[in-house]
Amino acid sequence: YFSLHGRGDPARALMTHAKVPFENIEFGFDKWPEHKPNMPNQQVPCLELKDGTKMGQSIALTRYLGAKHGYYPSADALAAFHIDQLIDRYQDVGTTIYKPQFMKEQADKDAAIKTLAEETIPKFLDEINDKCKDGWLVGDKISLADFFVGGLYTNYLANEHITYGKDEWKSLLDKYPNFKGYGERYAAENAAYLASRGKHAI
C-alpha cells in the first residue's frame, strides 16, 4: 500500500493483533506507476499470499483475514451482518475524512473540515454512541468492525501527525466521551501495532 494508514491499516492491525507474521511493503506515490500493472484491478492495498495469490479490495481482503483468524463469525449470519453493517456505514466517513490532506486551496480544505466536523462524523458517532460505552462494537471481543472504526480514532481524531483539523478533532472527542473511551481501548489493545507502524498524517 502507499505510505499511508488509510485503507491498508485494518489488515495490518488485524494481522499484528493475531500475531501473524507478514511483510509490510509501503511505497510513495512516485513509485505507483511501476507497481500498478501488477496489482489486482490495478489498485492497492494488495494482500499477497505465500503461494503468490494477490488479493485486492481492502474490505474483502480484511474480511478474509478476519474469517481466517477469528475476528469475523462466518458461521453466524446475524453477527456477521452487524459487523458488515458497521464497516459499510463507516465508509461514509472513511472515504471522505482523508480528502482535506490532498486539497490545495485552503478555502476548499476549510469547507471540507467543517462538513466533516459538523455533519459527517457527528452523525456517525451519534449512531454508534451506545455501542461505544464499554467493550467492543459487536460481541464481547474485538472483531473485524473494530479494526475499521477504531482507525477513525487512531488514524485521524487522535493522530498527532495529522496536518489538518486538529482543533476540530479534539472538540469532537470532547463531545463524544463514549467514542473517546472506545478509541483509547482500541489503541491500548493494538499498542504493539501502533508502536511499530509508520508515523503518517493519514
Question: Residues of each region from the PLM?
Answer:
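GST-like fold's C-terminal all-alpha helical module
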Residues: L65, L78, H82-A188, L194
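GST-like domain detector, emphasizing the conserved glutathione-binding G-site
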Residues: Y1-T115, E119-K123, L137
